[in-house]
């Protein structure tokens, strides 16, 4: 074992083993290694961890005592975890040694040394012979090599797949160009056979003849062997590249066409006598179909690229105005919140036909057409004359309303804004199947008086409201509605019913209060009120007269007095007056 490996093992023993032990475990280790290290009493007391490591390296030169340390630590319970660490470190060192031994170069033998030193006579003879055979002009040489046919058979699919890991020869197709970028590793047997052939042959072209008979995988190694010879008559690299014809191959392939000898990493162009090498070694036959996808860099002509792919033309019709608003024309979308203004729509917007089933916007506010919106909250300014006739034929499908919305959504071409939270409903866009709010009419005043004894206060409020309306006619409800757009049918009916109830004469209300019996559906009530009801009703009537005073009309005062007289004329009230309360009523 080399000294470097022993040094690695010693580092593990000292740094990963002895340094992690406490004093007690270290003294126990010295005691257990007493016979192996031949420690005396003084040595056990004086030697520290470094001296023990040096002594273990001396006594166990194989691994610096690492295996012995692991064996001893297994017997100590406190160092059981340290044993696994030491074994892992030991395996790492062993793996390093294996890798280094495999990657170490082969030593040069005497036969190899003799092969590198080729006799100069053979080189001279071969160079002279090659000078006679090579034409002097580059044009004639190019035509000659192009006319020659390859002497080697083409590789089949199986041989090509098997030889992908081997060095690439110029005859090989570019399908295995990835392996040609790697440094070729020549097998030892092929080198020895070729070198032995070059030594034993007497003819100057024996080596080239032998190389022509071997498979294409061994030809590359033979060419690299012949490359070391100092041949004077060889083909320069410029002649190799001049054989490529740019007329028959596209520009993308010309950029990737290189001779395979030049592509080899760390190797020069193979210099071989031209008489022994056929044209297939010099002119690599490259076809665009066989190039790798990573190697091909096709230059697409400008005419083949469509114009729409070069510039992305964004039409205004595809621009969105908000987060949840559908795609619509920019000419019809405004971000104003209260007063949307609709401008003329171009004819290209007429093709926007969107059904309601495709529009599922998670908004609670209905989106209706700006041309038909009439809401008490917004005042849209619409110019119907600017819309063309065919632009108003947008397809609307109210039956396909989305369940996530509370109201139908119509075409996006005329949406004023998607940010308005106020519901905008018109009589044109609301279908018959749309669920209208069922407004139950107000309870009759008789039932209120019969069930609630304090209904007189509500009556007083109604009187005050009518008096204020008579005094201030400009603040009424009728004038207030004149400034607003007309309501829908349901709202108009409700408003008319409410006005009719408010416009009832006060005499009718007083008659219902004093003379008509209460009518309820829950239970049957006696036609005459009880004593307690009459008592409270009398007090409320007296308070009504006192609070209103001169504000009430003469007719109202007269009816109130008639009601009090009618209540005082009953027998029960007379009995009640005998109890001491008749004085106040008579005075009134």
Curated annotation (Swiss-Prot):
Comp. bias (Polar residues): 172-183, 470-487
Pfam families for this protein: PYRIN (PF02758)
Chain segments annotated as coiled-coil in the UniProt record: none
Domain of life according to the entry: Eukaryota
InterPro entries reported for this sequence: DAPIN (IPR004020), DEATH-like_dom_sf (IPR011029), HIN-200 (IPR040205)
UniProt region (Disordered), positions on chain: 157-183, 469-526
Any GO BP: cellular response to interferon-beta
Pyrin domain residues: 5-92
Sequence similarity: Belongs to the HIN-200 family.
Family annotation (PANTHER family): INTEFERON-ACTIVABLE PROTEIN 208-RELATED, INTERFERON-INDUCIBLE PROTEIN AIM2 FAMILY MEMBER
Protein's recorded name: Interferon-activable protein 208
């Amino acid at each position: 074992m080399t000294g470097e490996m022993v040094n690695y093992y010693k580092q593990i023993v000292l740094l990963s083993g002895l340094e992690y032990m406490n004093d007690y475990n270290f003294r126990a280790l010295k005691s257990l290694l007493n016979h192996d290290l031949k420690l005396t009493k003084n040595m056990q007391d004086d030697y520290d961890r470094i001296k023990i490591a040096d002594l273990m390296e001396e006594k166990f030169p194989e691994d610096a005592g690492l295996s012995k340390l692991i064996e001893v630590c297994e017997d100590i319970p406190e160092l059981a975890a340290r044993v696994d660490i030491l074994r892992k470190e030991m395996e790492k060192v062993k793996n390093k040694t294996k890798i280094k031994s495999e990657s170490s170069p082969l030593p040069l033998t005497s036969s190899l040394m003799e092969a590198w030193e080729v006799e100069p006579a053979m080189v001279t003879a071969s160079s002279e012979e090659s000078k006679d055979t090579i034409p002097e002009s580059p044009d004639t040489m190019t035509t000659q090599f192009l006319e020659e046919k390859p002497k080697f058979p083409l590789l089949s699919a199986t041989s090509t797949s098997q030889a992908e890991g081997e060095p690439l020869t110029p005859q090989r197709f570019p399908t295995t160009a990835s392996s040609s970028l790697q440094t070729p590793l020549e097998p030892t047997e092929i080198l020895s056979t070729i070198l032995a052939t070059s030594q034993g042959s007497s003819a100057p072209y024996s080596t080239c003849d032998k190389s022509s008979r071997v498979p294409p995988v061994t030809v590359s190694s033979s060419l690299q062997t012949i490359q070391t010879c100092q041949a004077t008559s060889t083909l320069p690299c410029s002649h190799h590249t001049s054989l490529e014809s740019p007329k028959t191959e596209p520009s993308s392939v010309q950029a990737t066409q290189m001779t395979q000898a030049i592509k080899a990493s760390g190797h020069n162009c193979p210099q071989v006598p031209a008489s022994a090498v056929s044209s297939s070694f010099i002119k690599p036959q490259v076809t665009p179909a066989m190039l790798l996808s990573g190697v091909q860099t096709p230059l697409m002509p400008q005419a083949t690229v469509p114009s729409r792919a070069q510039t992305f033309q964004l039409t205004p019709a595809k621009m969105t105005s908000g987060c949840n608003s559908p795609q619509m024309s920019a000419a019809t979308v405004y971000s104003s919140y209260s007063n949307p203004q609709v401008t003329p729509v171009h004819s290209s917007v007429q093709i926007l036909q969107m059904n309601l089933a495709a529009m599922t916007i998670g908004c609670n506010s209905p989106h209706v057409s700006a041309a038909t919106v009439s809401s008490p909250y917004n005042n849209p300014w619409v110019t119907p004359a600017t819309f063309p006739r065919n632009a108003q034929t947008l397809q609307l499908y109210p039956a396909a309303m989305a369940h996530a919305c509370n109201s139908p959504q119509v075409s996006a071409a005329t949406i004023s804004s998607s940010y308005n939270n106020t519901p905008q409903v018109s009589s044109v866009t609301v279908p018959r199947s749309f669920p209208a709010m069922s407004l139950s009419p107000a309870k009759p005043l008789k039932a209120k008086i019969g069930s609630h004894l304090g209904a007189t206060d509500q009556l007083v409020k109604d009187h005050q409201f009518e008096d204020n309306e008579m005094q201030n006619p400009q603040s009424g409800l009728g004038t207030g509605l004149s400034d607003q757009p007309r309501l829908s049918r349901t709202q108009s009916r409700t408003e008319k019913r409410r006005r009719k109830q408010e416009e009832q004469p006060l005499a009718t209300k007083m008659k219902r209060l004093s003379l008509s019996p209460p009518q309820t559906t829950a239970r049957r009530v006696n036609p005459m009120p009880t004593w307690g009801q009459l008592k409270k009703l009398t007090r409320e009537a007296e308070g009504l007269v006192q609070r209103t005073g001169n504000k009430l009309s003469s007719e109202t005062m007269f009816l109130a007095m008639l009601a009090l007289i009618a209540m005082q004329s009953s027998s029960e009230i007379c009995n009640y007056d005998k109890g001491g309360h008749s004085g106040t009523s008579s005075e009134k």
